[in-house]
């Protein structure tokens, strides 16, 4: 696959000779033919491939997550020696990584489940890397990982030891969930600016370009400004001819499922997963649009003022999403005994990965100041933003509701913020109801 090829080329570019193997002989030959003069050495049997490596062997697996990973590991095992290291760089479900780590360590092998973010380009030029597994095995591969990782502005490589067994893949899963949330928040901002102000694509590009110079500076805002003005071969704006059905690979779903297992209110990211699901009901939505009534969007008033409100709402929404995501990391760390370092995790997201953003430094700073902080919203910087920006978020959500513009993640952000700051919630009534019909008992205040 492209990710595997690009990681191999990245490693080779740092002065290493890389043995390569693919089940398909043609694919192996293709990679070698496309990269003449590179220190890539092809092998056509698993045995020859494994025997070409110096011990302890460091084998990077890049295969489709699931049964394919197990069969690849099974094919390697007969030729491995005790202490050899297998690194799984796929988008693997963390529970599978926990299982594989346990099974392989019982046989004397090391297994490092590694999240890799940055897409195909990141794999080649420097991704963000999230390794989890045996600490001593990580130390043996750390020099290579540090050389191939993205480098943040302060010169630090975007890789750090995450924790035992499935910790690396868990952090990658939450990273992907946060990515879903970021993308949906941006999509809702776009919808509001189009629906409320009727901005042209050029105006949208200018707006996002301005936003990218400030607090919202990030990879996703940066690419979005370019997307607005991209045209197809007929000269039409590409974004306007793309069908409004967002696909997904299931990693956002895993994050939400884990939040339910841990009892964590990951509402914003979960709404972003649901938003993709409802977008895929295109036929039903078109039919429903002819039957179900609602308000037509009215102009949102002063242009500059509304743009600034949406910008503030977007930034505060993003903060709520990360607060929920990092709160879930804390719950998972407690549940699985990982001892995660949240400030370091935010640090390795600063370059190479899809969610890279200027404000991640603020998260690192918050944890440096108070490693035990229960929720990022309580950190002084984020509390100040919430104080200053919540009215904009409330105004934008109110406008959207009054004008029939769906804003599931903006709405989730304000609902979570108000629930989290509520000393008293109406859950007492729910407890009374539960006790009434099921003798579930209750606690008195």
UniProtKB/Swiss-Prot annotation:
InterPro entries xref list: 6-PGluconate_DH-like_C_sf (IPR008927), 6PGD_dom2 (IPR013328), 6PGDH_C (IPR006114), 6PGDH_Gnd/GntZ (IPR006113), 6PGDH_NADP-bd (IPR006115), 6PGdom_BS (IPR006184), NAD(P)-bd_dom_sf (IPR036291), Pgluconate_DH (IPR006183)
Reactions performed catalytically: 6-phospho-D-gluconate + NADP(+) = D-ribulose 5-phosphate + CO2 + NADPH
Pfam families: 6PGD, NAD_binding_2
Chain residues that bind NADP(+): 1-4, 22-24, 63-65, 91
Protein family per UniProt: Belongs to the 6-phosphogluconate dehydrogenase family.
Subunit (UniProt): Homodimer.
Name of the protein in question: 6-phosphogluconate dehydrogenase, decarboxylating
Designated gene of the protein: gnd
